[in-house]
Amino acid sequence: MIDQWKVIISCLTAEHAGQTDKDGKKKILSSLDMLAPKEICTETYMVVDSFPTEVEAYNLTTYLKTLFVRFLISQLAATQHLSKDKFRLVPIQDFTSSSDIDWIKPIEEIDKQLYNKYGLTDSDINFIESMIKPME
């Protein structure tokens, strides 16, 4: 793993004890970053996945920024500590250029692709968008 590109997140959620912002929304992920080959992190961070290419790591980073993914994580994140088991509702994707998702699009467009791929209704989408704060 040391010789690959890594995507890391903080092991703590962005919210203190699950509190929402003034609009009633949550960010969920407090810190999200990529590490180049030969870079490592402390146990303060969790390595979400590692890849042979920077593009795949970047695409995973983009995926984690979507409202779709962060909503799914939030369904299992009852405390402010994030662990790998909080990701079990998150569908695995292909982050290569062969993917059925166009990872080059803006995050809002990727969310729309994911909503369509998984057959979410307008009601589902409105609920997700009312609960999760956009991430840049």
Question: What are the roles of these predicted feature ranges?
Answer:
Residues 101-136:
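Amphipathic alpha-helical coiled-coil/heptad-repeat segments
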Residues 1-100, 116, 133-136:
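Polybasic, glycine- and aromatic-enriched phosphate-binding surface used to engage nucleic acids
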